[in-house]
């Protein structure tokens, strides 16, 4: 759950959303109101937080918070 909490913190900071609104099933664009620029900035913030590089081809697949958590866990962070 630690990865989720860290992801949630980044999402809350980047998108200025209520922490209660960020759930594993939340979709970044549809549910949390992000636009394409928000998504780019979110990916950059996640890369910095977790010290990883997320290629554009992978970033496009990160639709929900669960997708983000799974991806970061897969990288072993």
From Swiss-Prot:
Q: Which GO terms describe its cellular component?
A: cytosol; membrane
Q: What would be an example GO MF term here?
A: acyl carrier activity
Which positions bear O-(pantetheine 4'-phosphoryl)serine? 36
Q: Name where it's found.
A: Cytoplasm
> Which InterPro entries does UniProt cross-reference here?
ACP, ACP-like_sf, PP-bd_ACP, Ppantetheine_attach_site
Looking up PROSITE patterns in the UniProt record yields: CARRIER, PHOSPHOPANTETHEINE
Keyword Lipid metabolism recorded: yes
Pfam families according to UniProt: PP-binding
Keywords from the named record: Cytoplasm, Fatty acid biosynthesis, Fatty acid metabolism, Lipid biosynthesis, Lipid metabolism, Phosphopantetheine, Phosphoprotein
GO biological process: what's one of them? lipid A biosynthetic process
Task: Summarize the protein's role.
Answer: Carrier of the growing fatty acid chain in fatty acid biosynthesis.
Record protein name field: Acyl carrier protein
The record lists the organism as: Campylobacter concisus (strain 13826)
Q: What is the lineage of its organism?
A: Bacteria, Pseudomonadati, Campylobacterota, Epsilonproteobacteria, Campylobacterales
